[in-house]
From Swiss-Prot:
Region 2-C-methyl-D-erythritol 4-phosphate cytidylyltransferase, annotated ranges: 1-234
Residue(s) at site: Positions MEP for the nucleophilic attack: 156, 213
Organism per entry: Rhodopseudomonas palustris (strain HaA2)
Pathway: Isoprenoid biosynthesis; isopentenyl diphosphate biosynthesis via DXP pathway; isopentenyl diphosphate from 1-deoxy-D-xylulose 5-phosphate: step 2/6; Isoprenoid biosynthesis; isopentenyl diphosphate biosynthesis via DXP pathway; isopentenyl diphosphate from 1-deoxy-D-xylulose 5-phosphate: step 4/6
Keyword Mitochondrion belongs to the record: no
UniProt-listed PROSITE patterns: ISPD, ISPF
Name of protein: Bifunctional enzyme IspD/IspF
Top-level taxon of the source organism: Bacteria
């Protein structure tokens, strides 16, 4: 049996994406709660035939990139150049030490690439050495002059729209890029054009209409609406937590260190607000509770910061392809007073979860001096979480719901 080719992938993410409007480089903007760059990277990182994934980024974006793609497995990013062509060459040079048989070159602005399209690219490159995915042109195309007047109507039967990932034998596309750089040619808009210039025959294979490139604000608006509509399984969970006071000079509440004349008796930092939110999110997922994921008998959680627990719960939602629609927590105590802390608490929860602060509510009440909270023996918190998951008639265990 013939061995499959050793395939690597380059994800080009060094551009600025100015046509996409405000909000920073488009590859770091979110769609349905998930960064575009993460959506583009994951299919390559998890594809069984791709052994190495090489991101190419702008060095100014290092922190943003690392946060956006946390949890994915890939090679350390390399810095890009002034043009897409220079960025691709940087990625190729970084992969040279691995000497793959095939390289796939993909734009981070195409976040809807599928495993099937990646597989077709690998097969095509193995057969012809240079190939790109294309889709048919369905509209009539007009060629115009500088004044916008029509000068020709090309035969659309001979036209195709190019996509990525474009696939090549690694040695030939690396050589083509190096030759173009030596000759001062830096005006190519894709890698297939460089291959053509270098004298290679470039074949085509079936692309995917859904594998669109995000370019304008309208693209983002349309795809956000489409993805959100697909998240039709709306779920709500509730949570409750309580901790008694002990010795200390501060308490942790909703991610903030709050000065107080007492501390919490707790295994972790005792943040009742975040603990209640964790239980609410896990409840919405039907995924146990905070104690089952972080047992108080486990010494590794002794004194642990509760923002880790909340981030873990948020990641569980993302792993199911979902997003958090709303978070609400109610603090029940006499002191400390929550009112002055309400907005900083909302902001901190938003920072931990990645949920817009406009979708985070913090409320406070007392028990009218009744019970343990009324006697100032501790603090309680209730929480609710609304999440949206991809709709399916099947439950998490594969049974009809």
């Amino acid at each position: 049996m013939q061995k499959p080719p050793r395939t690597a992938a380059i994800i080009v993410a060094a551009g600025r994406g100015l046509r996409a409007g405000a909000g920073g480089p488009k590859q770091y903007r979110t769609l349905a709660g998930r960064p575009v760059i993460a959506r583009a990277l994951q299919p390559f990182c998890t594809h069984p035939e791709v052994f190495a994934v090489q991101p190419v980024t702008n060095p100014d974006d290092t922190a943003t990139f690392n946060e956006a793609v946390a949890g994915l497995d890939f090679r350390p990013a390399v810095g890009g150049g002034a043009t897409r062509q220079a960025s691709v060459r940087a990625g190729l040079e970084a992969l040279a030490e691995l000497n793959p048989d095939i390289v796939l070159i993909h734009d981070a602005a195409r976040p809807f690439v599928t495993p099937d399209l990646i597989s077709r690219a690998i097969v095509a490159a193995g057969q012809t050495g240079a190939a790109l995915p294309v889709i048919a042109v369905n509209d009539t195309v007009k060629q115009v002059d500088a004044e916008g007047c029509v000068v020709a109507t090309p035969d659309r039967a001979q036209l195709r729209i190019a996509q990525t990932p474009q696939a090549f034998r690694f040695d030939v596309i690396l050589d083509a890029h190096r030759r173009a750089a030596r000759d001062g040619r830096d005006d190519f808009t894709d890698d297939a054009a460089i291959a053509e210039w270098a004298g290679l025959t470039v074949s085509t294979f079936e692309g995917d209409a859904a594998n669109m490139k995000l370019t304008t604000p309208e693209d983002f608006s349309r795809e956000e609406s489409r993805l959100t509509a697909a998240l039709g399984d709306i779920r709500t969970g509730t949570g409750y937590d309580v901790h008694a006071f002990g010795d200390g000079d501060h308490v942790w509440l909703c991610g903030l260190k709050v000065p107080h004349n007492r501390g919490f008796l707790a295994h972790s930092d005792g943040d009742v607000g975040l603990h209640a939110l964790v239980d609410a999110i896990l409840g919405a997922l039907a995924d146990g509770d905070i104690g089952s994921h972080f047992p108080p008998t486990d010494p590794q959680w002794k004194g642990a910061a509760s923002d880790k627990f909340l981030k873990y719960a948020v990641d569980r939602v993302a792993a199911r392809g979902g997003r958090i629609a709303n978070l609400e927590v109610t603090m029940i105590c006499e002191r400390p007073k929550i009112g002055p802390l309400r907005d900083p608490m909302r902001q901190r929860i938003a920072e931990i979860t990645g949920v817009p602060v406009s979708r985070v509510a913090v409320k406070a009440t007392t028990s009218e001096r009744l019970g343990f909270t009324g006697r100032e023996e501790g603090i309680a918190a209730t929480a609710s979480a609304t999440i949206r998951l991809p709709w399916s008639p099947w439950g998490a265990e594969g049974q009809a719901s």
